[in-house]
UniProtKB/Swiss-Prot annotation:
Keywords (A to Z) from UniProt: Glycoprotein, Glycosidase, Hydrolase, Signal
Recorded GO MF terms: sucrose alpha-glucosidase activity
Listed InterPro entries: ConA-like_dom_sf, Glyco_hydro_32, Glyco_hydro_32_C, Glyco_hydro_32_N, Glyco_hydro_beta-prop_sf
Top enzyme category: hydrolase
Organism in which the protein naturally occurs: Aspergillus rugulosus
Protein name (database record): Putative glycosyl hydrolase ecdF
Glycosylation sites recorded in the entry for this protein: 99, 122, 275, 362
A GO biological-process term: sucrose catabolic process
Any GO CC annotation of this UniProt entry: cytoplasm
Length: 508
């Protein structure tokens, strides 16, 4: 019965223009990267780049949605609007707990949001401020905008202020100052600015590709910075993390999201040498412009991250909406004998809307056997743990019917995890919409490989191991492609555990 209800819900979502069941999408029209992610009280706030009047990029405002669990979302009115010929580009939010900005009171400190003001008439970009004194429900633009003008940017920007955007702002307690990180796109650099009141800013330093030891030369076009301090699990230390989205050089081609670690003294970020094997936060094509939620307790020991799942502009075959939020994931940093590495997992709130559907333990699967062929579903959470003989390929096909399928595969011979979209459904909308995306994934110390696949109406997000690697891809299969098949090639595998959960209920 649960599966039947799920298939009906997922079918309704697909019939409604590929709308997902448990991922956020706008009610209508265009969405790109998330903005200003912040938790206020028990409410998660999602702001995002949004064109409310058309299904293409342009006329960008801050869309707004709220949630109590990061699974179910409520659409809210626009937060920061495009007006007077100035669009509201990407930015971030932060709680001004001490009211250093003077935009609230000591009894009711404000929430602040910095964003890039974009002038379509001439391409100018400057930095602007808005504030909220009603817990993020409504936002007022600062009357002294811009807080950093294009003229002020010009000495630090090769284009004279035409390519300075995406402010990431946080309060740095050790220096007692606000820090702003700005991206400079094709110049492959970030600039760092400081302020004592969140309104008046001074340039402090630049970070360029030549200052990042070991950064591959193919990584170009730096966009959408995020920066924060996290504990290093396995030690008693903390470190700083700088995330950004390069336009080129990612494992799957096109935009990708990488993370640098290092130290920060309030003025200069000093990056550690890059370990290419742990550089990328996603090996798929569709994880772009990632940001993390602010105002979480330090005791959590992790950040919660989300990105836009779309690297094809207006090309995907959705007619009433464009752009989907990746499912929120935790991000934590760990220390091993060989170095530091990140782990990512879907937020645990997903478990609260799931009911176990299939459970298998300690079963050997040999070539010729096909498991799960009688199971149907288009919105699923599949978790597999297995050990494989030499030369074994374990293959999990999802959204399968006839010749159509998306194949998640693990190859023992070269220890790789992959997602194959070659026959996943509609791919003609963009030259990059098909193909195979691969990530390195070694078994754990006991020889067990773990795979977790989140499957929704038009996406797969595959987490390998404890979350050492992730592959996120959009897919557009037929509505009737709802089958699964689990099999092995070239050897046997022992399924230590297999669990399959349906997603119960739509997101919105």
């Amino acid at each position: 019965m649960f599966l039947h209800i799920l298939c009906l819900l997922a079918g309704q979502a697909l019939a409604d223009d590929y709308r997902p069941v448990f991922h956020f999408v706008p009610e209508k029209n265009w969405m790109n990267e998330p903005n200003g992610l912040i938790k206020i009280g028990s409410t998660w706030h999602l702001f995002y780049q949004h064109n409310p009047t058309a299904n293409v990029w342009g006329n960008l405002n801050w869309g707004h949605a709220t949630s109590s669990d990061l699974v179910h979302w409520t659409h809210e009115p626009l937060a920061i609007t495009s007006e007077n010929g100035i669009e509201a580009f990407t930015g971030t939010s932060y709680y001004d707990a001490e009211n250093t900005s003077g935009l609230g009171t000591s009894d009711n400190p404000p929430y602040l949001a910095w964003y890039t003001g974009y002038f379509p008439s001439n391409g100018t970009q400057d930095q602007r401020l808005a504030f909220s004194i009603d817990a993020g429900e409504t936002w007022t633009k600062f009357e002294g905008n811009p807080v950093i003008s294009a003229a002020q940017e010009a000495p630090h920007d090769a284009t004279g202020g035409l390519e300075t955007r995406d402010p990431k702002v946080f309060f740095h307690a050790d220096s007692g100052k606000w820090i702003m990180v700005l991206a400079h796109g094709g110049q492959n650099k970030m600039s760092f600015w400081t302020s004592v009141d969140a309104k008046r800013w001074s340039w402090a330093s630049d970070l360029t590709s030549t200052q990042v030891p070991g950064l591959p030369s193919a990584v170009k076009g730096w966009e959408v910075p995020d920066m924060f301090e996290v504990p290093v699990h396995g030690t008693d230390k903390t470190t700083w993390v700088l995330i950004f989205t390069p336009a080129e050089g990612s494992p799957a081609g096109g935009n990708g999201v990488l993370a640098l670690t290092g130290s920060f003294d309030g003025t200069v970020f000093h990056p550690n040498p890059v370990n290419v094997s742990t550089l990328w936060l996603d090996y798929g094509r569709d994880f772009d412009g990632a940001l993390s939620w602010e105002n979480l307790p330090d005791s959590d020991g992790h950040r919660i991250l989300a990105a836009i799942s779309n690297s094809y502009g207006a090309n995907p075959p959705t007619n009433t909406w464009k752009g989907m939020l990746s499912f929120p994931r935790t991000l934590s940093l760990h220390q091993s004998q060989t170095g530091q590495y990140f782990l990512q997992q879907p937020v645990s709130n997903l478990d609260t809307v799931s009911t176990p559907l299939v459970s298998v333990k300690n079963q050997t699967i040999a070539p010729g056997q096909v498991l799960l062929s009688s199971v149907r579903g288009t919105a699923l959470d599949i978790r597999i743990a297995f050990s494989a003989n030499a030369g074994t390929v374990l293959s999990l096909a999802v959204r399968k019917a006839g010749s159509q399928e998306t194949v998640i595969q693990y190859r023992q011979s070269d220890a790789t995890l992959s997602v194959d979209r070659t026959t996943s459904g509609l791919t003609s909308y963009d030259p990059a919409a098909g193909g195979v995306h691969t990530a390195p994934l070694r078994p754990d110390a006991s020889g067990v490989v773990q795979i977790r696949a989140l499957v929704d109406t038009c996406s797969v997000e595959v987490f390998g191991g404890q979350g050492e690697v992730v592959i996120s891809d959009l897919i557009f299969p037929d509505e009737t492609s709802d089958g699964l098949a689990l099999q092995v090639i070239g050897g046997t595998a022992v399924l230590r555990s297999l669990e399959k959960f349906p997603r119960l209920g739509a997101v919105l």
